[in-house]
């Protein structure tokens, strides 16, 4: 077993060796620009790019012409949300999203608010899922876009996107879905979900960093305002020379996910349950954050009451985990996702996100269980609050001298 152990698969995944092998020729031998139409170097690059486009499209049930290459999911989210809102603003300026979305969507929405759009930020249920009835009630005559993710990046909780898609389609409202954490791990089909726009990322499915895609529906055609000016690449949606090796890697990663994803999900789910049951057997006052029934297979987001998440992360420093999203973990604020689920600030501060994936082993899971149980017990020994609770004191009845 190699130390350190990687259990942060929602932040990024290692590039699969088969993906790397597919990419290598496009760095030095077949190095052409896919937009160079006048010679064989360009033709070979373009051929590879189009083959990858087919693979990514097949993974999500789309046609290749509906896949637009980007630099990653953040760009895909920005292009979808801002591009659609700006194009369709003559029909209305009301947008709907959810309080637990990724920052790339939330901050795009805030940027649009500054441009005069009105945004409704929906609450989620205690289990982290969006109740479709809340969405239905929020739609108005001037609503033009709904943006709801498929699976949450912190809790792994899966929203009922098929039902959401039926509601938006019936209302004639565009539906953008951030499918970054689900594509390749769960079945995700743009037709089944009535999705009009979907964000995808290579590095969340064992592909390279710095390459993403945006699915843009053609029937009925969805229009966007480009967010970057330039040579009009990608049918005018996204200018810029294509990252050919990265795109080839994305294509291979998508192919592997399509062929092996179901079997892999089963294996990873068994490992996740082994981790959960092991922690549960060794510790009390342990809370799983978010629905277990509706969740990506490799996610376990747990709060260890009376233990600071940051302190536990330092105590298990040879295990790579996170306390929240990698995009916001520089902040010491408790996770906004957990707070939106109604989880107390103290419990949110004590949360750890374990992300398991393709290269996680049983041996690693068992080692992590032993280590976490040992360190949580040790940290709780230093907690007077934990001691009081064990002695039967109801902390909610205590009047503190200096309430924090």
UniProtKB/Swiss-Prot annotation:
InterPro entries: Aminotrans_V_dom, Aminotrans_V_PyrdxlP_BS, Cys_deSase_IscS, Cysteine_dSase, PyrdxlP-dep_Trfase, PyrdxlP-dep_Trfase_major, PyrdxlP-dep_Trfase_small. It catalyses: (sulfur carrier)-H + L-cysteine = (sulfur carrier)-SH + L-alanine. It is found in: Cytoplasm. Its cofactor is pyridoxal 5'-phosphate. Its EC number is 2.8.1.7. GO terms for cellular component: L-cysteine desulfurase complex. Pyridoxal 5'-phosphate binds at residues 73-74, 153, 181, 201-203, 241. Keywords: 2Fe-2S, Cytoplasm, Iron, Iron-sulfur, Metal-binding, Pyridoxal phosphate, Transferase. It holds the Pfam family Aminotran_5. Pathway: Cofactor biosynthesis; iron-sulfur cluster biosynthesis. It is an enzyme of class 2 (transferase). Its main location: cytoplasm. The modification N6-(pyridoxal phosphate)lysine is found at residue 204. One of its GO terms (biological process) is [2Fe-2S] cluster assembly. The active site is at residue 327. Master enzyme that delivers sulfur to a number of partners involved in Fe-S cluster assembly, tRNA modification or cofactor biosynthesis. Catalyzes the removal of elemental sulfur atoms from cysteine to produce alanine. Functions as a sulfur delivery protein for Fe-S cluster synthesis onto IscU, an Fe-S scaffold assembly protein, as well as other S acceptor proteins. Homodimer. Forms a heterotetramer with IscU, interacts with other sulfur acceptors. This is Cysteine desulfurase IscS. It comes from Anaeromyxobacter sp. (strain Fw109-5).
């Amino acid at each position: 077993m190699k130390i350190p152990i990687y259990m942060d698969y929602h932040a990024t995944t290692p590039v699969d060796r088969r993906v790397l092998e597919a990419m290598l020729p496009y760095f030095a031998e077949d190095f052409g620009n896919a937009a160079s139409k006048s010679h064989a170097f360009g033709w070979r690059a373009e051929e590879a790019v189009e083959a990858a486009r087919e693979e990514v499209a097949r993974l999500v049930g789309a046609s290749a012409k509906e896949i637009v290459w980007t630099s990653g999911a953040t760009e895909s989210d920005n292009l979808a949300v801002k591009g659609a809102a700006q194009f369709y603003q003559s029909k209305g300026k009301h947008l709907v999203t959810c309080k637990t979305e990724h920052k790339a969507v939330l901050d795009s929405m805030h940027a649009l608010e500054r441009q005069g759009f009105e945004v409704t930020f929906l609450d989620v249920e205690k289990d982290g899922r969006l109740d479709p009835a809340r969405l239905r009630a929020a739609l108005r005559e001037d609503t033009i876009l709904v943006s709801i993710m498929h699976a949450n990046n912190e809790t792994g909780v899966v929203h009922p996107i098929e039902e959401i898609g039926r509601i938006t389609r019936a209302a004639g409202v565009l539906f953008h879905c951030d499918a970054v954490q689900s594509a390749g791990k769960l079945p995700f089909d743009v037709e089944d979900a009535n999705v009009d726009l979907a964000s995808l990322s290579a590095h969340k499915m064992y592909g390279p960093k710095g390459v993403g895609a945006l699915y843009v529906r053609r029937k009925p055609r969805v229009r966007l305002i480009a967010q970057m000016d330039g040579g009009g690449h990608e049918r005018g949606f996204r200018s810029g020379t294509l990252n050919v090796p990265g795109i080839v890697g994305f294509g291979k990663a998508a192919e592997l996910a399509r062929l092996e994803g179901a079997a892999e999900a089963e294996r990873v789910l068994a490992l996740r349950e082994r981790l959960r049951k092991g922690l549960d057997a060794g510790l009390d006052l342990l809370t799983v954050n978010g629905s277990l029934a509706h969740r990506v297979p490799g996610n376990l987001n747990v709060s260890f009451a009376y233990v600071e998440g940051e302190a536990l992360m330092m105590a298990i420093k040879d295990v790579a985990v996170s306390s929240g999203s990698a995009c916001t973990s520089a902040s010491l604020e408790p996770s906004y996702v957990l707070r939106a689920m109604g989880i107390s600030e103290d419990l949110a501060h004590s949360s750890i996100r374990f992300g398991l994936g393709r290269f996680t082993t049983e041996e690693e899971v068992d080692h992590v269980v032993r280590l976490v149980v040992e360190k949580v017990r040790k940290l709780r020994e230093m907690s007077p609050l934990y001691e009081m609770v064990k002695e039967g004191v109801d902390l909610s009845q205590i009047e503190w001298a200096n309430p924090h």
